[in-house]
Amino acid sequence: HLSDDQGFRMEIKKYPLVNTIGSVRGGSEVVSDGKRYVDETPHEGYFTQDELCGLVAYAQERHIDIVPEFDVPGHCIALIAAYPELSCSGKVTEVRKKWGISKDILCAGNDKVYEVVRDILDEICDVFPSEYIHLGGDEAPKERWCNCKLCKQRLSELKLGSFEKLQTYMVECFREHLAEKGRKVICWNDGLGDDANGEIVSQVW
């Protein structure tokens, strides 16, 4: 689980703001004595690629294969905090302190999103030799897409018919990119539509 709304934990060399901004959280939601509140103690940190390569080597010596997860298009607030233009609104936000599901996800109509995600996947593949790469796909509300000019335009151009199928299209773009590198994709079951590529492994939770 390299990334989530609450922090991006892998060094990404091509996009350094992922680490200087995306790995820093101003507080954390906690539950104590039955009460839920935000502890404003700052939290930050990420693994360098060298550290992760060392972890991979340590695991391989013990016959363990580490499968990295980079969740898209949801659970990306840390990435969006670093690069707000990747969201539908483009508004500046902060790394999420609370748990739960955010309405802000990556914009499916923005070509820059596809470029950035592919670049990040390239760096993940450079570090992790695993046959599989997990793309998450769960808990991605479509509210922002429904009101986004670029998303609606892409939906119309591709004649997909629904925003759920737009997510299927998005995942397929990244599956094809990873397939060129000899990698296979895993996604959470609720992020896969009936028309998803049969080569994608569905993980049920």
Residue ranges and their predicted role:
Residues 185-190, 200:
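Flexible, acidic glycine-rich loops studded with aromatic residues
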Residues 192-198, 204-205:
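Conserved alpha/beta catalytic core and glycan-binding cleft of carbohydrate-active enzymes
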Residues 1-183:
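Substrate-binding cleft of carbohydrate-active enzyme catalytic domains
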Residues 171-175, 189-195:
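N-terminal active-site wall of soluble small-molecule enzyme domains
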